Curated annotation (Swiss-Prot):
Protein name, as recorded: Putative glutamate--cysteine ligase 2
Enzyme class label: ligase
E.C. numbers: 6.3.2.2
Family according to the record: Belongs to the glutamate--cysteine ligase type 2 family. YbdK subfamily.
TM stretches of this protein: none
UniProt-listed NCBIfam families: gshA_cyan_rel, PRK13517.1-2, PRK13517.1-3, PRK13517.1-4
Keyword set, alphabetical order: ATP-binding, Ligase, Nucleotide-binding
BP terms from Gene Ontology: modified amino acid biosynthetic process
Function: ATP-dependent carboxylate-amine ligase which exhibits weak glutamate--cysteine ligase activity.
Stored HAMAP family: Glu_cys_ligase_2 (MF_01609)
Record-level Gene Ontology MF annotations: ATP binding; glutamate-cysteine ligase activity
Lineage, opening ranks: Bacteria, Bacillati, Actinomycetota, Actinomycetes, Micrococcales
Reactions catalysed, as given in the entry: L-cysteine + L-glutamate + ATP = gamma-L-glutamyl-L-cysteine + ADP + phosphate + H(+)
Amino acid sequence: MQRLEFSESERSTVGIEWELALVDGATGDLVPIAKEVLGELGTSDGREHPQITHELLMNTVEVVSQVHRTVPAAIADLQELIGMVREVTDPRGVELMCAETHPFAQWYDQRITPSERYDRLLDRTQWWGRQMMIWGVHVHIGIDERDKALPIVNGLLTYYPHLQALSASSPFWAGANTGYASNRALMFQQLPTAGLPWQFGAWANYEEYVQDLVTTGVVTDHSEVRWDIRPSPKWGTVEMRACDGLSTADEVGAVAALIHCLTDQMLGELDDGVKPVTLQPWFVRENKWRAARYGLDAEVIVAPDGAERLVRDELAELTETLAPIAERLGCAEQLAQVHTILRTGASYQRQLAVAEANGGSLQEVVSSLTNELRNGLG
């Protein structure tokens, strides 16, 4: 069996990936100009900028922070990269947008980035694969020992609905109000190896799992395991991929700070010989559905005995509990933004409010999202 080496990584470092949709500033439609944008931002020898990259769809670019010790530093890095992208997109009349789904675009109008990897994915997944018109925020946290990675993954599943509800930003799909806060959460899990992770107890179990998938042709390597929360052996991190796309730097910072603090807390518990609290897989699955459906109004299961609480109350209390850790990690201001989201509304709530105030116009929803990304919530 092939062994998966877990790279050395400084403990509790942070890196953030932010996927951005390219939209016509006048119509709000998606525009497939990623190749042109990346070409102008690339290196002199024709390679992509190392921190501004392509994605599955040609209407998307991704900005990727370097590895940082604090969330504020990672956010500043991302904002600088977005500024570079705007130098190319602004003259073209193209705006940047980030929500987990585009409110009215149709999947069959979108062009795929030429890539053997993407061709293989779509050949296998067909209709479901073509539906992946989604944009997200991924947060990596450095793990200092390989054997801590899977307990951290399992522990973070307890807080999955908190992060899903806080970031939920996909109430619309192809012009329809889905009735869900995060339609994306239930769409993405249709892909093979996507969705909730298996709760493995040891690294050897994960290696056996990946080997089984490679042997049977499900994946070519571990990077094609697309769990919502996964170990990333290449970087020596745990990667949180459950969050919907977020349209402001403050919201990205809030979610990243919450993930940073939770992971650091669990690392400390593991140092003390205490495994993070985990929930039964059936509770984890139910929590994912509840957060996707009801967002911040979801009542979620918070303990192995089946105790339930309103997720917004959980988030408010959790933010206070983690405040000392946030101070130590240098992200107190960002973690406090969780309270702001609870007070002013998550993205899905703001989008629904804009649509209602404008006679159901989804073009106005796109306009509000692009304005948020450019100017913040004010």
